[in-house]
């Protein structure tokens, strides 16, 4: 009768959990179906430019001009047209950016995102409030989220719980705004933070031959054969177009030389005194002249500049910026005076104007573009780059202060590197904590022989996991991380996506390593903040003598399946829509209890509190039966290499002490440990080494003491025969 009631209770509990999960999925997914009657982008335009007209989208970046009558008021565009930088979710955030004609940001508004913490968690209004900081910022200014060593930078506060998301938004807004402003001619091209341009030493001149200039790197050469050019088009639609015959592959396609003419030792030796003086007189401050000379069948000038005014076959690149040349930047070069110079079929001088902020002391590349026609109006381009570095004796570098050097280094670092620098304290503390945990795990046999010390150490570690890893560093791993990783593997995997959150990245690396060595238990028992919170609450309940309830093992074993079903459902939803899967992943209370510290809508808080209340009476109910992350880790845990949890042949038959004491019921009645369920608390190992508690060990010690007291060899008792 009792058994039947238990099975009925288990069935009811299982049905309730599944029903609750389905209800939660439906409720959170339904919130994404709200229709928008009025486009948000038009609302923002009406707010900042009331009564203005909007042109059709134009150019590579689909920029729309905002006008009122004949007056241009500004420009509107979407960041997705400029950069597709992935955010924390692995997908880009789309921002509508409004600029005024002076290159000042009027508005930056988030149109679309897939960020889990913002979809359900942090109110979206907090992100909109963050974006309001960009109003009034010039596109050439540097904006930093958090601290910065650059005193000239504009610093803005992050959104708690969404630091990575807003740092990506900052990168997207400033990069897109600057790129479009340059394209529109509102600001000068160039990076917003770079070294101070070096100065050309006009006092340094030495008569030098062509051979010497080539030898010291002042003149650079790029020789391309027809075969090399054909090979560059392999794998494109232009493969096989205009290819050279086998005997023609070694023929010269172009033999190209380039140099910077401003240094007197180069310019005067090549152009002669008068031609060099005329050239320098026509250059404005900050402008630089370059000579390009070539032989071969390919013309670096082409004929495009005649029709469109732009040279489409040759350009310079420095600091990631492209320096294009127009017909007004071109001077015909016919007379060259350098001793030993070969004859050239084609020669030209190009001028980089002051707006490009060219630095003669920094490396640059001459880029040669080669085009092949693949259709009536379609062409395929490939490029060949020739690097150039100015010899040091021709320039003078302007020394930078320590602050300027630090600011330049910070500005030129990738986004994920800056995030690691900003979170260096959290990273350092967590690395030390993981090192301590590694020592505990490798020396577990020593630690478990001192149970009182190990229990205090473990409880302290769990407090650290909840307070520091969870609530401070926001290092709560989630099944969403797993789904994102799986989708990244089959789509567009980029390491920087996972490196943007250093705490999560480090914890995942350690968790992956620990799974291979010991199974899922190390993370679930030591590093999961919500799991640690449950365990500490349950420990307090036991101290208060609150009754504890455990299901019969046969029922408990069958309820394990729920978490695997939850994982499969989430994975199936993610195949259809990752956004829906992120909403459905609210079956995890992690975001509520850890990331947002219970600061969200009451129904989410009620769900998390409900799980913690159940945990008072039965330890880690959520972890045992519902957690999809634990299910995913358990599946990968089957690849573990070692089994360091020791057992005796008497474990399970007849001894049941460890099985009865295991707080998560991970030990089967027959004595073996189920590593899919074990949380690696090491309680069973403390019992294993406890000479006053482990029955087989007690019996073994009794035998040893008895054997020690027994004589080593039988002693003969002397007998004296007495005659009668």
UniProtKB/Swiss-Prot annotation:
Assigned keywords, A-Z: Activator, Cell membrane, DNA-binding, Membrane, Transcription, Transcription regulation
DNA-binding region listed in the record: 215-234
Example of a GO cellular component annotation carried by this entry: plasma membrane
InterPro entries: 4Fe4S_Fe-S-bd (IPR017896), FMN-bd (IPR007329), NosR (IPR011399), NosR_regulator (IPR052378)
Position of the signal peptide: none
Pfam families on file: Fer4_5, FMN_bind
Main location: membrane
Bilayer topology term: Peripheral membrane protein
Compartments it resides in: Cell membrane
SMART domains referenced in this protein's UniProt entry, alphabetically: FMN_bind
BP GO terms, sorted: positive regulation of DNA-templated transcription
Gene Ontology molecular function: DNA binding; FMN binding
Family named by the database record: To P.denitrificans NirI.
Physiological role: Transcriptional activator of the nitrous-oxide reductase gene NosZ.
The name this protein goes by in its record: Regulatory protein NosR
Species in which this protein is naturally found: Stutzerimonas stutzeri (Pseudomonas stutzeri)
Name of the gene this protein is made from: nosR
């Amino acid at each position: 009768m009792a058994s039947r009631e238990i099975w009925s209770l288990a069935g009811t509990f299982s049905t309730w959990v599944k029903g609750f999960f389905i209800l939660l999925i439906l409720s959170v997914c339904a919130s994404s179906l709200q229709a928008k009657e009025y486009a948000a982008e038009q609302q923002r335009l009406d707010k900042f430019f009331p009564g203005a007209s909007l042109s059709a989208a134009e150019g590579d970046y689909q920029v729309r001009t905002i006008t009122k009558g004949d007056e241009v008021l500004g420009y509107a565009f979407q960041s997705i047209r400029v950069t597709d930088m992935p955010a924390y979710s692995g997908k880009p955030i789309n921002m509508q950016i409004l600029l005024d004609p002076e290159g000042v940001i009027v508005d930056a508004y988030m149109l679309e995102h897939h960020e889990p913490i913002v979809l359900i968690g942090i109110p979206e209004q907090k992100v909109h409030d963050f974006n309001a900081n960009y109003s009034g910022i010039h596109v050439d200014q540097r904006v930093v989220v958090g601290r910065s060593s650059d005193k000239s930078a504009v610093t803005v506060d992050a959104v708690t719980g969404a630091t990575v998301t807003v740092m990506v938004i900052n990168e997207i807004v400033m990069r897109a705004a600057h790129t479009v402003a340059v394209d529109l001619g509102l600001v000068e091209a160039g990076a917003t933070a770079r070294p101070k341009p070096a100065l050309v030493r006009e006092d340094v001149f030495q008569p030098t031959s062509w051979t010497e200039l080539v030898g010291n790197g002042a003149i650079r050469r790029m020789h391309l054969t027809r075969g090399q050019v054909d090979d560059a088009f392999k794998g494109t639609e232009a493969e096989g177009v205009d290819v050279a015959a086998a005997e023609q592959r070694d023929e010269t396609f172009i033999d190209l030389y380039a140099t910077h003419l401003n240094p007197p030792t180069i310019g005067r030796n090549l152009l002669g005194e008068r031609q060099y003086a005329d050239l320098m007189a026509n250059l404005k401050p900050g402008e630089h002249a370059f000579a390009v000379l070539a032989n071969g069948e390919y013309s670096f000038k082409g004929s495009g500049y005649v029709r469109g005014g732009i040279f489409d076959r040759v350009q310079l690149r420095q600091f990631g910026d492209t320096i294009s040349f127009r017909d007004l930047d071109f001077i015909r070069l016919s007379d060259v005076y350098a001793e030993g110079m070969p004859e050239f079929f084609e020669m030209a001088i190009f001028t980089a104007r002051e707006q490009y902020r060219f630095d003669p002391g920094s490396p640059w590349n001459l880029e040669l573009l080669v085009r092949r026609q693949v259709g009536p109006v379609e062409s395929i381009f490939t490029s060949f780059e020739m690097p150039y570095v100015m010899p040091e004796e021709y320039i003078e570098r302007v020394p930078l202060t320590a602050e300027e050097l630090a600011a330049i280094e910070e500005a030129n670092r990738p986004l994920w590197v800056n995030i690691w620098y900003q979170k260096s304290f959290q990273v350092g503390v967590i690395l030390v904590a993981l090192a301590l945990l590694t020592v505990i795990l490798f020396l577990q046999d020593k630690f478990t022989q001192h149970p009182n010390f190990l229990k205090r150490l473990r409880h302290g570690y769990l407090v650290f996991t909840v307070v520091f890893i969870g609530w401070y560093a926001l290092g709560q791993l989630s099944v969403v991380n797993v789904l994102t990783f799986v989708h990244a593997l089959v789509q567009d995997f980029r390491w920087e996506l996972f490196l943007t959150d250093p705490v999560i990245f480090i914890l995942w690396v350690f968790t992956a390593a620990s799974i291979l060595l010991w199974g899922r238990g190390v993370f679930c028992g030591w590093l999961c903040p919500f799991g640690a919170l449950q365990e500490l609450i349950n420990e307090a309940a036991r101290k208060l003598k609150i009754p504890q309830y455990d299901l019969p093992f046969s029922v408990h074993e069958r309820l394990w399946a729920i978490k695997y079903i939850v994982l499969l459902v989430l994975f199936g939803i993610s195949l259809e829509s990752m956004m829906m899967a992120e909403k459905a992943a609210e079956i995890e209370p992690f975001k509520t209890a850890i990331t947002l510290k219970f600061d969200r809508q009451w129904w989410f808080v009620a769900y998390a509190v409900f799980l913690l209340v159940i945990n008072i009476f039965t330890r880690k109910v959520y972890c045992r039966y519902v957690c999809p992350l634990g299910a995913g880790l358990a599946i990968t845990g089957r690849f573990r290499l070692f089994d360091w949890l020791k057992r005796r042949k008497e474990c399970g038959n007849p001894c049941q002490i460890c099985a009865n004491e295991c707080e998560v019921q991970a030990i089967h009645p027959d004595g073996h440990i189920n590593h899919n369920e074990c949380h690696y608390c090491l309680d069973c190992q403390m019992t294993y080494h406890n000479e006053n508690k482990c029955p087989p060990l007690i019996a073994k010690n009794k035998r040893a003491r008895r054997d020690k007291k027994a004589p080593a060899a039988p002693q003969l008792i002397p007998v004296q025969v007495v005659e009668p």
